[in-house]
Swiss-Prot record:
Catalytic activity line of the entry: [protein]-peptidylproline (omega=180) = [protein]-peptidylproline (omega=0)
KW Nucleus (keyword) present: no
Main location as per UniProt: cytoplasm
GO CC, alphabetical: cytoplasm
Function: Involved in protein export. Acts as a chaperone by maintaining the newly synthesized protein in an open conformation. Functions as a peptidyl-prolyl cis-trans isomerase.
GO biological process, one term: protein transport
Cellular location(s): Cytoplasm
Pfam families: FKBP_C (PF00254), Trigger_C (PF05698), Trigger_N (PF05697)
Protein's name according to its UniProt entry: Trigger factor
NCBIfam families for the chain: tig
Keywords: Cell cycle, Cell division, Chaperone, Cytoplasm, Isomerase, Rotamase
Family: Belongs to the FKBP-type PPIase family. Tig subfamily.
Amino acid sequence: MQVTETQAEGLKRAYTVVLPAAELDAKAQDRLVELKDKVRINGFRPGKVPLSHLKSLYGKSVMAEVIEQAVTEANGKIVEDNGLRLALPPKVELPQAEDEVKSVIEGQADLKYTVELEVLPKIELGNFKDIAIEKPVAIVTDEEVDEMVKRIADGNRSFDAKEGAAASGDRITVDFVGSIDGVPFEGGAGEDVPVVIGSNSFIPGFEEQLIGLSAGEERTINVTFPTNYLSAQLAGKDASFAVKAKQVEAPGELTIDDEFAKTLGLESLDKLKENVRERIAKEHEGATRQRVKRQLLDALDAGHKFDVPPTLVSQEFEGVWQQIQTDLQQQGRTFADESTTEEEARAEYQRIAERRVRLGLVLAEIGERNNIQVTDDEVTRAVVERARQFPGQEQQVWEYYRRNAQAMASLRAPLFEEKVVDFLLELAKVTEKQVSREELYKEEEEKAA
C-alpha cells in the first residue's frame, strides 16, 4: 500500500492511496477458494468447481467485496499510523472512469483512490477548580404556597347560574366572530366559549368589555392584538368581535380548608400545602440548576478556544436553522417580526452551532479522561420515564426505543452531559446566594420577553 498525504490544513486531512493489483487479486483468489467449498453448482460435485468457473460467475462481486474491505482497512491504518481521531466517517473517492474501474475489477490495475478526513482537535483542558459559580437559591415562602393554593382553588371553583349582567369574576359563556377591516380571520370564531372575566386568558381588553352583558345580549368588542402576538398576521392589528352572551354564572364561595383538600384526594389543608411547597421547591431547584449549568458552560466555552470540525458545525447549524424556519412558518412570522434580518439570524445561529459543537467536544473529552459513563440501567430508567409520559402507550414507546438506536442515543447524550456537569460542579468553586423567586426567574423571563 502506498499512501501520499495531499492536505494537512487545520482539521482537514487528505490522502491518495494506491492498493496494488497483486494484493487485491490474491485476496480475491483466497475468497474464491473459500467459496469453492460452500457453493453448490449443478454439474459439479461439492468442492470440485474449478476456480476459473467460480471466477467467471462470482469474480466481479468477490473483487468488489475485497476492494470494500481493503479500502476500509487502509483508511483505518492511516488513522492509526497518524494518531488521528475522526470527527466523521472518511469520505472516499473511488475511480469513476469505466475503463479504469473495469481494469481494477479484473485485477489488471492498481486501485488508486483519495480519502478525505475531518479530525477532532486536540483539546487542552483547563483547571476546573478555578471555575467560580454563583448558585442562586430561592427559599419557598409561605406567601408563594398560599398563592399557589389559591390558584388551585380558583381552578376548581364552582360557578352557579345567575340572573342579570356579568361582573368581574363571573364566568360568561359566549359565541363570537372576529374580523379585521370587516373580514373574518382564521381562528377568530368560537362557540360556547367560557370566559372568566378578569382571568386575563384572552386578548387584552376583551374580558373587560364583557362586563354588563346579560344572557341573550349581543355586543361588538374592539381590541388591538399585542405587537408580540404569536400570529404575525394578527400582531398589532385592530380587530372587532361580534359577541353573543349565552349564559352568565357567578363564582361559588371559595373556602380553602380541609374539606377542599379532601376533594383533591388529600387528607388535610396542611398536606395540600406540603405538596405545593414540594412542587414549588422542585421548580426552584430546576431553575437553579439551569442558572448554574449555564454559568459552567459559559466558563467552559470561554476557557477552551480551538478549531472545531466545520462539517460538525454545519450539521448542527442546519438542524437548528431548519427548526427555526419551521417554527416561523407555523407561526406565520418572519425575521422582521423578530426585529432581525435573515442574515443576522444566520450569523447568530452559526455562532450558537459552533458553541454547541465546541462544548460537546469539551464535555466528551472530560468524560473520556475521567471515565464518566452512562450505564444501561440509567438509560433504561430514562426510557421508562419517557414511557410514563404516554399513558396507555408505554409498550409502544418501549419498543420504539428498543428498536431505534438513534432514539436511544438521544436519551443517552443528555444523561452523559448531566453526569459530566455534576462531576465539574464537584470541582468548581460553587458559592450559594439566597435570592428571591423574582430574582431566580428574572433571567428566564427577560429571555422570553
